[in-house]
Structure formats: structure tokens, C-alpha cells
Amino acid sequence: LYGERAGFLAIVIHEKESMQKVISQVRSLIRTTYSNPPIHPARIVKTLLKSPSLKQEWLEELAIIRARIKEMRHALFVGLSANGNERRFAFLNEQSAIFSFIGLDARQVEILRQENGIYMPANGRINVAGLNTHNINYVVEALLACNIRK
């Protein structure tokens, strides 16, 4: 589903008068972002949720993925905090998403790309799900070296 760009948006509105304004803004964002949502992810989700066995299998797989991402976040935190930076990188243990902004600027991201073959958007958003036990030390060392040049 990740590659299919499935998503969900929920907005709680306490004042009825604000509802049309919010709907208008959301429609504007939708129009500039993707215009028409893909139908394939919705069909996948429908199939998964209608079948108890598929739903259970999916939930088990999600639990495994969440645990692995949490483990990699913690490993990233431990590695980056080795030199007394615990407070600076504490957010890594507090977050749970696939991506995290790690505080690099565009110049530092370019250094990582050129010197270490580590790719991420210029805003410093790292894909934690792309980390594993084989590359975490390499990534941590490169990030620390890049941060030292700040």
C-alpha cells in the first residue's frame, strides 16, 4: 500500500460555520497535489478488511514493520547520541513514522550524497525504514561526520 500512496485524512471541526471553509481549503490542496485519488489502494484495503484472515495477516505484518522501524529509530538515536547528543536526538525515540527530519541542511545532504552515497531530500528527511542492521553504522558515521562540518 505504501507504494500505492493510499491515505486518510480526518478533520475535527467544532464550529459548523467553519466546515465549508475547511472543505474548500482541503479541496484546493487535493487539486494541487493529486487531483484524482488512485482507486487501486482503496480496492486493496477493501479486500484486506473484508477478509478476516487477510486482515489478521496484514495486522501481523504491520506489527513486524512497526517493531523494525522502532528498532532502527532507536539504533539511530544510540549511534547519533554516542558523543553526548542525547538531548539533540531524543526526538528519534519519541517519533514512530517512517520518515524523520534529522536537522541537516541542503549543503549537508549534498555532502552525504557526494561523499557517502546516502540519498535523501534536501530538507534532511531520512527514511528510517531504509535503515537496517547492515547499514546503520555506516549511516550514523556519515551523519556524525557531516554534522561536525556544520
Q: What are the roles of these predicted feature ranges?
A:
Residues 1-21:
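Active-site PLP attachment segment
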Residues 2, 39, 91-94, 120:
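A structural signal for short secondary-structure junctions
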Residues 2-4, 19, 38, 69, ...:
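Active-site-proximal structural scaffolding
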Residues 12-13, 50-54, 82, 145, ...:
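Short, well-ordered loop/turn and helix-capping segments at boundaries between secondary-structure elements
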Residues 23-42, 48-77:
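Structural signature of PLP-dependent enzymes
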Residues 57-115:
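Conserved PLP-binding catalytic core of the aspartate aminotransferase-like
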Residues 104-150:
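PLP-dependent enzyme catalytic core of the Aspartate aminotransferase-like
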